[in-house]
Amino acid sequence: MMTLSWQWLVMFLLLAMTTTSATTMRNIMYLTGQHPIIPNDASLRAPITHLALAFMNSNIFNNEQHSSSWPIFMSVEEARSEFEPGTKIMVAIGGWGDTSGFDTAARTEDSRARFARNVASMVRDTGADGVDIDWEYPGGNGEDYKEVPNEEKAWEITAYPLLLAEIRKALGPNKLMSAAVPGIPRDMLAFTADTVSQIMESLDFLNVMTYDLMNRRDNVTKHHTGVQLSLDSVNAYMANGAPADKINLGFAFYTKYFRVEGESCAENPIGCPTGLMEDPETGADLGKTGGFSWHDDVPEDVRGSFEKTLDKGQYDEQGGGYWYWDEDQALWWTFDTPAAIAKKFPLIVEEKRLGGVFAWGLGEDAPDFAHLKALNAGIERLAKIKDEL
């Protein structure tokens, strides 16, 4: 009887450990080459479950010959030494404007296999725990959408799941694989009811980029990372078959501002016409948009306006975002404060039962790391709620 009791106890403990591991919320940070800054405070690093080094260029994985070096701003070994044991270190491939490598890779069965073999070799050589595929975006609407029309990229919609499947096959089942995916529905060309289930077969999770939801392609003011627009993003993926527990909500550790031409936005600041912000022929920025991370110096020409934004800005309870309209400079400001970050946990993460969160990017929040603290606090709050259930 004693032996049987001990056997049951061991089984119970193993089950408890498995359940705890399975329900641990992901807290993913991108560490970027632009701001490769890691907090010195160990208590800020401890809640981070995954670190994604961004970026490695997609083109290098199309080489026929196996590479002897994998250029990135920080080695996996160095990154691992900075974080708690057990933190998963991933390599992010691609990024905004890096589409040609993916285009080449996805075209044929042979090119997909070559790309996948090289990705697997990189993971093995660097000691990474996995990869994040950041193709912006399969099917079109990327940086080059005026140069290469979407109809010329329509084939990528069916090729994208095939490329992911080939990478997963090469990596094997024990390495992590994620994808950073668009937050704006108009950019979700490759993420349909027909494709999402195929995509999710290859991935451990999706990083939904619920930021930059207002950009130069828009023509009215809105929150660039607001609650309602973020819910629209998450709901779109879930409606097309992505499980909630495989979705990570994106947070932006930076500001955005837009210079509005024409009528004043004083009476109706949200949804106010902005005027043209990109060249209709080339897609180039017309100089009416801007932004900076919390680590960057504030540009001199908007310093005074930004100070007013911090002092007089307000939170929109309906759309769920911090904003300010500067009437004097005709500037629309939109970003998350730590308080705005806190609100997203009950309204989105908890409400939709998401599997985790991520932020772009860790070093962008230096030196105060106020937004990281808010993100960590949200994670810890949800963990306590789960423990009490």
What are these regions (language model features)?
Residues M25, P47-T49, P85-I89, G127-D129, ...:
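Short, well-ordered coil/turn segments that N-cap beta-strands
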Residues F73-R80, A116-V123, I157-R168, V196, ...:
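Generic structural signal for well-ordered alpha-helices
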Residues A22-V123, P149, L372-A374, E380-A383:
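Glycan-recognition patch characteristic of GH18 chitinases/ENGases
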Residues I93, F251-L347, A377-L389:
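Glycan-binding loop/region signatures in secreted carbohydrate-active enzymes
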Residues L51, V91, I133, I167, ...:
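Conserved, mostly hydrophobic/aromatic
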Residues I60-P71, P138-D297:
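Substrate-binding surface in catalytic domains of secreted glycosidases
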Residues T3-L4, F12-R26, K386-L389:
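N-terminal signal peptide
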Residues L31-G33, F55, V91-G95, W135-Y137, ...:
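A cross-domain feature marking catalytic cores of carbohydrate-active enzymes
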